Amino acid sequence: MLEGAELYFNVDHGYLEGLVRGCKASLLTQQDYINLVQCETLEDLKIHLQTTDYGNFLANQTNPLTVSKIDTEMRKRLCGEFEYFRNHSLEPLSTFLTYMTCSYMIDNVIPLMNGALQKKSVKEILGKCHPLGRFTEMEAVNIAETPSDLFNAILIETPLAPFFQDCMSENALNELNIELLRNKLYKSYLEAFYKFCKNHGDVTAEVMCPILEFEADRRAFIITLNSFGTELSKEDRETLYPTFGKLYPEGLRLLAQAEDFDQMKNVADHYGVYKPLFEAVGGSGGKTLEDVFYEREVQMNVLAFNRQFHYGVFYAYVKLKEQEIRNIAWIAECISQRHRTKINSYIPIL
């Protein structure tokens, strides 16, 4: 017997939840990956993908087929699915889906700003932007000279606007300031998304809060790793960490003081969920920290589908689909470069 909240969930969102579960069922199987890694050329890869749910998505691509073309078409396809979900969603699912696009918007704005700094063609950079993070004012990013310019002229009408309140300054935009801006935006965004999910309650909070806590902790680890050997002070580094997650607050304080990878690993050793991840780095498989974090992310997103009546399945599906796209692009790159020794270093999903 369905309880009241679950019954209302089905009325408002049941169709889309069923649809996204169907999409998840169409992800590539392990047998598909076995077939893909045996392909000799990108044309072979294209032919095999035609036998999967991807169908003729490369039909309009002219020869020669490239990894970039395959990657672009896969992203477009994912974007089409996501836009269908968004166009047919009701509140508060609509707001949840908008939160999902914000990370892609941040990832699009930053390269555009760096490109403007280096006098690169806006059109060239736009071609590399993620379709899920596109917004009308993107092309005007090159007119901004300070974060305040960026906010007032470009981002004030976008979903990113609320996250800029903590990032406003009159500092000139150089490469370091732009990178700091990226991390501050992500911090504000993740904190707001986490608060939204927590306040929503029910199964959505139970599924999404641990996923976002992991994302916050992952960002803290990666920020720390990337700051070694740079001019970023320990105090400034700590201000970039999202203020929630398993590491918050004591782990973040210790992480801010770390001076190398071993000291960072010592912090992770205090947390049962992170200790095995750091132990898996290197070794015979040559895994990077990024690899083990992706593997953990996949596990969490697959588990999200074990629960019903929640928004987390939409987030989980997009993340799993993105990992599938990375996997196919990796295999395609290995085929293209004739570098087959690493072709099996993709991250399995199912």
Curated annotation (Swiss-Prot):
Transmembrane helix found in the keyword field: no
Keyword vocabulary terms for this entry: Hydrogen ion transport, Ion transport, Transport
Pfam family, one: vATP-synt_AC39
Superkingdom: Eukaryota
SUPFAM superfamilies given in the database record: V-type ATP synthase subunit C
Gene Ontology molecular function: any one: proton-transporting ATPase activity, rotational mechanism
GO cellular component, one term: proton-transporting V-type ATPase, V0 domain
Role of this protein: Subunit of the V0 complex of vacuolar(H+)-ATPase (V-ATPase), a multisubunit enzyme composed of a peripheral complex (V1) that hydrolyzes ATP and a membrane integral complex (V0) that translocates protons. V-ATPase is responsible for acidifying and maintaining the pH of intracellular compartments and in some cell types, is targeted to the plasma membrane, where it is responsible for acidifying the extracellular environment. May play a role in coupling of proton transport and ATP hydrolysis. Regulator of osteoclast fusion and bone formation.
Membership in a protein family: Belongs to the V-ATPase V0D/AC39 subunit family.
Quaternary structure annotation from Swiss-Prot or TrEMBL: V-ATPase is a heteromultimeric enzyme made up of two complexes: the ATP-hydrolytic V1 complex and the proton translocation V0 complex. The V1 complex consists of three catalytic AB heterodimers that form a heterohexamer, three peripheral stalks each consisting of EG heterodimers, one central rotor including subunits D and F, and the regulatory subunits C and H. The proton translocation complex V0 consists of the proton transport subunit a, a ring of proteolipid subunits c9c'', rotary subunit d, subunits e and f, and the accessory subunits ATP6AP1/Ac45 and ATP6AP2/PRR.
Protein name, per record: V-type proton ATPase subunit d 2
Species in which this protein is naturally found: Pongo abelii (Sumatran orangutan)
Organismal lineage: Eukaryota, Metazoa, Chordata, Craniata, Vertebrata
Gene, per the UniProt record: ATP6V0D2
